[in-house]
Structures are given as structure tokens and as C-alpha cells.
Amino acid sequence: MKKTACLALLMAAALALGGCAVSAELAPAPAPEGATARAQVDWPKERLETDENGVPVLDVYVVADEQVERVDVETYVEGVLAGEMKNDWPLEALKAQAILARTFVLKFLADKQSKYEGADISTDIEEAQAYDASAVNDRIRQAVSETEGLVLSAGGELPYAWFHAHSGGLTALAREGLGWDKDEPPYTQIVPGNEPESATGEKDAQMLREAQHWQAAFPYEEVEAACETLGVDVTLEDGAKLTIEERGDSGRAVRLGLNGQTVDASDLRIALGSTKMRSTLITSLRAQEGKLVMAGTGYGHGVGMSQWGAYGMAQAGSTAEEIVTYYFKDVSIEKLW
């Protein structure tokens, strides 16, 4: 799935793991205001067994171990949270990510089947979400415990819980950020990303700088091969005409003109590598010295929650509920177990 590969790969690379453990006695917190004890949300409970506490159990193919492991959803979400976001980030940002991670896996189970035999889902970033059980600490456990069973609901349905590292200023609709060719989901919207200008600590500060602005150079043959996988025959040379044929409402490139041929920008990003071509918010594009050189802002497809935006909002005092409902419109947070 295009959006899954893009989303998980860029997060795993953009947000290196680290941080300090936080000792805490963990207990599930009350559901947010508006969340019911057992909400009427359509989710694939018939596919899953539950443990003695009523928490669904997953068969997860762990790529690193090359085997299927049985874990409950909450334990799985801990590993995802540690893989998708730094484990020393503000607690409310981690809680927001946990709600999205839980929603993501249930939406995956509702719509898809893992390519790994005997598994419900995997830790393969091309299939689902990043996962790093070794980076789980007390802060991660607290974020998951305090959001236990909570998911996003869009009119009683599980939404696509999209997220990205940095919006570059504005979030995107799915049709421009992901090349979404279906009806635009009613819960996506373009809003200011709310990312901070600076971050505390040298590691976070460096990560933020890399997410704010990027530049990449691709040899012509690499670009031509990538375009070929997309069914577009492109030949590049120094001085070739390169244009942004169409931009979406958030300013992202939707279609690129490469020496007379048109290619979908989000597709090209995946084909070239989403950790190199970090976004489609392209600010410059040129062909010189045997390479396609481009620069841009932001990191990721731009749809849904900005992780750096969640960081900034949490630092400013926003709750997890306020964060996720800022990025997704007309949604509620509901408790499934």
C-alpha cells in the first residue's frame, strides 16, 4: 500500500530512537470527555481473540526475528509507538501517536490481510507501521496505558490514521499528499502544521532542522529507472526542462514535468525513496552535472497529524485529544475496551 510504505519508512528514518526512562506506576486513565465505555464503532472484533482482560490479541510477524509472535494490541502499540516517535518526547504527543497507532492497526485488519502467512499484521514498514520493542520505556508504557482502547471514530467508522514527520507549514489533503484516487475522506483537512521553530536538545534540534528543509540529488539513470517503474519513459540531460505542472491546495507538487513527460509527484517520491525525496513541497528543481537536483520543505506526505506539530502542541500544553482532533476534522475519540 503506497501510503503505508511512505508513511512508515519516513518515520523510521526521520525519528531516531532514544531518550530516558520515566519511572511511574501505570494505571489506565479515564477516557476523554465524549468517549463512552464501549463505543459503537465498527471495527473487526470478529477477526480477533481477546485475552482475559478483553483486549484483542494479534499474531504479529516480527521481521527481525522472522517469526510470528502473539501479543495483545496494547503491547503491539507500545512497540509501534517506540518505532514511530522518540521515547522521550512530550507525553501528550506520545499519547496522540498511540491513539493513531491503535486506530491504524484496527483499520488495517478491517481492510487488509498481511502478506505474511499466519499473521494479522507485521513489523514490515512497507506493509504497516514501524516497530521497535527494544526502545519501549516507562514513558511509552504510560502513553499507551493512559490511552488504552482509545481510537479515532469518523461517524462510527475507523478513519485512516495518517501521520507524517513535518508538514512544512501546512498539512495536505490525501489527493495531493498521497495521490489518493478515491473520494477525499471527510476527515482530512489543510491546517497549519503547528511545528516549532526549534527543539530542546541537540538530537531533536538536528532532527527538526532536517525535517524543515531538505535537498537531494539523483543521477539521471536513477530517475529514469524510477519513472520506468511508474510506466513513464523519461530521458534526462543537463538543462532538461523540469517543471511543476500542478500544485495542490497546500502548495505540494501533484504532477511534475520531466523533459516533456508528466509523472505523479507522490509516486515518484516513493520510487526514488521517501527518505531522500522527503516531501512533495518542492522549492527548486533543476538538471545539472548528470543529476536531478531538488530541494523542498517538510518531511512526509503531509496528510493527517504532523508529529513535530504534535510535539509543539504538547509543549504548549495541548492534550492528546486536542492534538488529534486538530489535525482530523469531525472525529471523536472512542473507547473500544
Model feature map: region roles:
Residues 1-337:
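Conserved, single-site charged/polar hotspot
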